[in-house]
């Protein structure tokens, strides 16, 4: 009959290290994370349009002056709205003196 001893696990040679360490960098790639950030409600007040009116006291087709508070004139000669000669205005740009309307 033979006698067989079970194998004894290998033991390190020399003293047992107090800590295991290595010089290889440890890099681990993790999965991407998805984060949904919902903004809080913000109240924005936009200014409304500014409505202003400029009343004009003109009457179309009347014999009163077309300009309120002033008299239209061509080189000092008054122009009435009750029909006037256009040559008075056009001659001003041609270098001629205005003739009375």
Swiss-Prot record:
Q: Name one GO cellular component term.
A: intermediate filament
User: Which Pfam family, any one, appears in the UniProt record?
Assistant: Keratin
Specify whether Acetylation is a keyword of the entry: yes
This protein's record includes keyword Membrane: no
Its domain of life reads Eukaryota
The UniProt keywords, alphabetically, are: Acetylation, Keratin
Q: Which residues carry this modification: N-acetylserine?
A: 2
| GO molecular function per UniProt | structural constituent of cytoskeleton
Question: What's the family?
Answer: Belongs to the avian keratin family.
Fill in the subunit field for this protein: The avian keratins (F-ker, S-ker, C-ker and B-ker) are a complex mixture of very similar polypeptides.
Name of the protein: Feather keratin Cos1-1/Cos1-3/Cos2-1
């Amino acid at each position: 009959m033979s006698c067989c001893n079970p194998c004894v696990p290998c033991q390190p040679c020399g003293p047992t290290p107090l800590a295991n360490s290595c010089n290889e960098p440890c890099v681990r790639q993790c999965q991407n994370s998805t984060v949904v950030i919902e903004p809080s409600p913000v109240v924005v007040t936009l200014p409304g349009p500014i409505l202003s009116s400029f009343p004009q006291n003109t009457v179309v087709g009347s014999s009163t002056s077309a300009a309120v508070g002033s008299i239209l004139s061509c080189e000092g000669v008054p122009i009435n709205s009750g029909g006037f000669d256009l040559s008075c205005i056009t001659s001003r740009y041609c270098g001629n003196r205005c003739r009375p309307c």
